[in-house]
Amino acid sequence: MPILTLVTPPQDLSAADHFCTLAVLHYDDTDAPPRFAAATAMLRSDPALPGVHLWAAAAAADPDAVAAHCAHDAAAASLRGGPMDWQPLLYLCYSRSCGSVNDVLACATTLLDAGADPDAGFLWQGMTPPFTALTGVFGEGEQGPRRQPRHAADPALAELLLRRGAHPVDQQTLYNRMFRPDNAHLELLFGHGLADAGPGPWEMRLGHRMETRAQMWRRQLDWAAAHRFTDRLQLLESFGIDTSGVQIAAPPTPPDPLARDESGATALHHAAWAGDLPLLRRLLAAGADPAAVESRFGGTPGDWAAHAYQTEAAEVLADWVREHPR
């Protein structure tokens, strides 16, 4: 299994390669719903694209095309290619422009039956930990759940990969999904041995370049404690993760509506980014300024909401400005 590094797609792409580029998560600031929608529209206007190559068929989750490509070339399921230089399973798992859950599962089953590696992955910009097929399914990350959503077939696709041999200790998944209190990913991974699984293929190949298990769990514990994710801490403890010494942060005081952090962002900026509508409304009622501009990006709370595709938060802010003219 060669180590893959995320590549920048070339500019002179074929239509099928362009579709793949639009459809998949890149884990950069180009990830956004309009790009995924553009891929869907492109496929709708040219339904023959999945027939061009297996990578496009996988990104489209077209079970007939995937089966046809695999029948034509039994080794195709393991071949790197397309604009990202990935194996087909990665295009399927990172696509956000694919078909129904049943179609996705059918494609995954065909690829795995044809020899696809359930632990396929790549090193994002050459860094560890790897972004695996599971990472793509579970989704989310630093750009937020609207820009980097979970796969439409999550959790069924993740369950299939795990049953077919994907290693449950997926460090990048644990990082990407730690920012919000939902624990569905942990429950599924623990059910497949996350707590005590032996070394995975990526750990064995990358060695000291990977975080140790102790470092991985410390990151999870520290974030959960700092953000008062008590259900997560209880879940970790129930599966034998050592939580001794963890100090849960004190309940937060009501944020000062006018205070700014080191980059000039207000509590209203952060509430807009998170899409926290109740907090957004409380801050506005307490005198928060929807026109406040932070210094790092030069954005207002409305700009932050728009960038995170928190459309409801953007609407609340726009309505407030309209109803409270200066």
Predicted regions and their residues:
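Internal alpha-helical scaffold/solenoid segments in large eukaryotic proteins
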Residues: 63, 155-175, 245, 264-266, ...
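Leucine-rich solenoid repeat scaffolds
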Residues: 233, 244-249, 296-324
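Surface-exposed loop/turn motifs in large extracellular/passenger domains
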Residues: 99-106, 144-157, 181-189
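Ankyrin-repeat boundary/"N-cap" motif
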Residues: 8-29, 48-59, 78-98, 120-146, ...
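Ankyrin repeat domain, specifically the short helix-to-loop turn at the C-terminus of the second helix
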Residues: 36-48, 68-77, 106-118, 155-166, ...
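Helix-turn-helix repeat elements of alpha-solenoid scaffolds
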Residues: 28-35, 59, 63-66, 106-109, ...
